[in-house]
């Protein structure tokens, strides 16, 4: 305890240190920040000054570099003038023209080039409109008449007719001076001949001997603006220019006035900047010399000025560059001040915070002492809870093993009793087996909870039929529904599920979803009904399944909330990418489980999917069902939720969807010439349910108990074209029969399908060519009668009297009589049905394969000219019923007949088997089961006994055989959990014995555990196969054949 106090004191000192440490850090950071800011400010000021001067220098150099067209124009003028003087052909325009055009065409910025003679004649080339305009010629005769004419753009020769032009009053000043006074050339500003109103710079040179003058005109704005175009991307830069001439005089030209400057960058001259031009003095330089840059600091806090002037033979061009200092400089300075202020405020805040934290630390010390004592108590409680949890896990594992063993015994007794039971007992045994499997599922659900929470659940991929799974789940729920007086039924809706191919997925987990939802509905419903509705829809439409996806709006809702609010993140993260959504072989199934129970309050709907949560106490259960259901649904790419029912409706509606993949075994339709192909019973059933209006003209008299069953049957009968007559009571059966018979003649026979039309339009080619369908779908009778009577609620004598009229009607009209029963119907009643000439007995609930049996019974009437079935005889009711089921509903018979279907009755005949089992009941059951399969069984009560028996058997075999040692046993069934020596140790020792003789006997592990660790342990010790109890005969045969085939 003293050590703890010392540690606590040391920790408090450390806390005080860490409280003061931030204050010291902040002060140090402030000092470093201020020094760094001042240094950086000075450096940036110097750098920005150099950058400013460099930017303005670059701008002026760029402008000066673009003055080259003026030099080229001046040079070309003197060159032409010298050429004309040397050749002495000054008066010949045909000789002057080509030289002028050559210079004109080589300089695109020349607006005009001309030659003027002393006698008043003139000749010029100009560009109409300026820039890249059309080249034309203009000339004047000595009498003062001016003409203009188009020229050839390649040679400059005039083409076409000359047109008169407005006479020009005067020549440019420098040209006039050269003609009158002579001289060495010069420049002047004037309007051009071809572009009136455009100020041009005329560069002139005299022709020797006083014969005339050559001049070239360049538009000042074209040259200057073109040079300034490259500076437009520079921000905070103003560029101005002005031009001043001397009017042709010889005196030096004056500098441009400040008001004469114009902006080159198109932003206009600010009044404040223009006012400063008068205080800026610049030095003029020749145009072909480097510009002299004068930088001025007038109003240096806002602007930096630079200027230069160019003297062009008496014409001065002035340029002013204004660099507006960026606003970022001021922002930087203000930011520095703000930063210093913030740093000071942070230091003050840190000081205050340190004081407050010191006071809070004192109070925390007292709480820490109290919490330390509580922590010690909680730590002890945690250790105790962990020990209890470990003991609970061990106890649960042991209890799970015992429960599985007991259930295995019950399942084995059911399996052994099945061959000796009569038909009524077989149905009860089937229900006992379903209930045993239900108990196993409850046990597995508790184990699955742990797997789901740890993320270790792996979905299996097996092929199964969705309709069969739905039917099995509803049948099992119906057992409870009968005892409670609740109507349980599967509503196929649009029959899209019945039209599907086989599905690949985890049928066990999917059935667990249905069983949990149906079980909850049965638990909380005391009256009314429980309905399972089902639809199927292909995400990529390619088949006949066209039911709309009834869960699309939920996906949009989830995406909306997850995007804007982060809600439902689990759903989005789990199903953000599902490859089956874009798989053409995938099918989306949507299900609804609707009941009329007590319902779920809205405030508890969000929590019902949590583990160990129940809506109401006192209804039993573990509270794990809906949590596991939601996990499995999401693993299958779907979502589950509680749907709103209509106002005033009782109960709850659970809706969920899953994405599964079809088996892809459905072959394409074959051509008729290719002959018949093998057609499965599933293909026949799916094709039959795709037919519509195939019994048009038939009448159905329907007397059924249960509103939902009545609704489903009526909707289905009407969908296949029958006219349905609802019977309100038993006493009304005869009268309704008479009404139906008298009204049948009103049907238009021509509108009914013939057999050939139905076969060719409805069934695919493979079914049309199949011998079975050809036999069942022969020539039809257009009309028929169907009587469906529900005898599940008794009143059999009244029904028998009412049905006599129907029996007499058979000789007149094709008729069928169908009775609906339930699990409470006795064997004596079955005998009475035979006396009533009942054609088909269907057990409620009526769905799936039973609807298929009913449909094929009607087909039987269509395939014969008599009312008697071609496939079923009336002499023996039992034979008739079983044969019909075998022909038209192979899946139904296979599901009700749980016995093994093999080529022989004794598939293990002659095999020598060693059974190692410590439970006496399981010994008896498994031994009898193996004997029934034809095996010779030896028993061992524990692992040590099994090792001794194996050692003795192999020694006897080795003595009798000289060359090779045969296997002492064909297969060994080894229980894993046994006293004295368990199955793992026994297997290890058996493998050691076998290694001496070079043999290996197949060993199949039998265990009541279903964890993956047990499977891996069995493989590690040398077992060949792992089977979880209870063990069925079918699984035994498959396991033995599997290991024996692998050995061979």
Swiss-Prot record:
Its main location: membrane. One of its GO terms (cellular component) is plasma membrane. Residues 912-1044 form the Response regulatory domain. It holds the Pfam family Response_reg. The modification Phosphohistidine is found at residue 401. Residues 38-336 are extracellular. Signal peptide: none annotated. It is found in: Cell membrane. It is a multi-pass membrane protein. Residues 1-16, 358-1048 are cytoplasmic. Gene3D superfamilies: 1.10.287.130, 3.40.50.2300, Histidine kinase-like ATPase, C-terminal domain. It catalyses: ATP + protein L-histidine = ADP + protein N-phospho-L-histidine. Activation probably requires a transfer of a phosphate group between a His in the transmitter domain and an Asp of the receiver domain. InterPro entries: 2C_system_His_kinase, CheY-like_superfamily, HATPase_C_sf, His_kinase_dom, HisK_dim/P_dom, HisK_dim/P_sf, Sig_transdc_His_kin-like_C, Sig_transdc_resp-reg_receiver. GO terms for biological process: cytokinin-activated signaling pathway; phosphorelay signal transduction system. The chain crosses the membrane at residues 17-37, 337-357. Expressed in roots, leaf blades, leaf sheaths, shoot apex, flowers and panicles. It comes from the Eukaryota. The modification 4-aspartylphosphate is found at residue 975. Coiled coil: none annotated. Disruption phenotype: Sterility. Histidine-containing phosphotransfer domain (HPt) contains an active histidine that mediates the phosphotransfer. Cytokinin receptor related to bacterial two-component regulators. Functions as a histidine kinase and transmits the stress signal to a downstream MAPK cascade. This is Probable histidine kinase 2. It comes from Oryza sativa subsp. japonica (Rice). The gene is HK2.
